[in-house]
């Protein structure tokens, strides 16, 4: 297995979130490792959260498993049941179909770096705290189905 040169993979902070939901993830930088390495059966991202940044809006996936491991720094995991501090070496997992909305918030003063892996067919998902859903064709809509 060849070593992956992270510096050769573009690091971006794009988001498809409509305003104002895009503001919370402005300090999230990520590299999509799967496409750059030829992996096609699951997604893998190398993510850096700058202090104050969120990984996403609090969300869930209808048909996608998600697994995360913190490499360095720390972040607050926010879920339906409350908050849990994650530090380097900690892992978290959400099976497909779980509606336990989740995200990370970097509430510290150092970067938090993590790997997140997702597998399964994209059939959309939801957002716990805001009026937004994500569709299977990669669109953001209000919970009543009207587009942003």
Stretches with model-predicted labels:
Residues 30-32, 45-61, 99:
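Conserved short histidine dyad/triad with adjacent acidic residue
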Residues 50-54, 74, 83, 98-99, ...:
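Short, charged/polar surface micro-motifs in flexible loops or helix N-caps
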Residues 80-96:
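Short acidic-glycine-tyrosine-enriched beta hairpin
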Residues 38, 96-123:
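Ligand-binding loop in jelly-roll beta-barrel domains
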Residues 46-50, 61-78, 117-119:
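Short, conserved beta-strand element in jelly-roll/cupin
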Residues 1-41, 125-148:
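A short, N-terminal "cap"/entry segment at the start of jelly-roll beta-barrel domains
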Residues 39-44, 62-65, 70-72, 87, ...:
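Short connector loops at helix/strand junctions that flank enzyme active sites
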């Amino acid at each position: 297995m060849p070593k992956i040169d992270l510096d050769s993979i573009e690091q971006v902070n794009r988001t498809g979130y409509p305003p104002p939901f895009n503001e919370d993830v402005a300090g999230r930088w990520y590299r999509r490792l799967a496409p750059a390495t030829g992996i096609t059966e699951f997604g893998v991202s190398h993510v850096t959260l700058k202090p104050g940044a969120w990984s996403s809006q609090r969300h869930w996936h209808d048909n996608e498993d998600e697994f995360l491991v913190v490499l360095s720094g720390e972040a607050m995991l926010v879920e339906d049941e409350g908050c849990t501090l994650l530090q380097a070496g900690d892992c978290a997992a959400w099976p497909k179909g779980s509606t336990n909305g989740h995200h990370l918030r970097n509430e510290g003063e150092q970067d938090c770096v993590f790997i997140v892996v997702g597998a399964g067919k994209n059939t959309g998902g939801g957002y716990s705290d805001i009026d937004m859903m994500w569709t299977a064709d990669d669109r953001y809509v209000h919970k009543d189905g009207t587009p942003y």
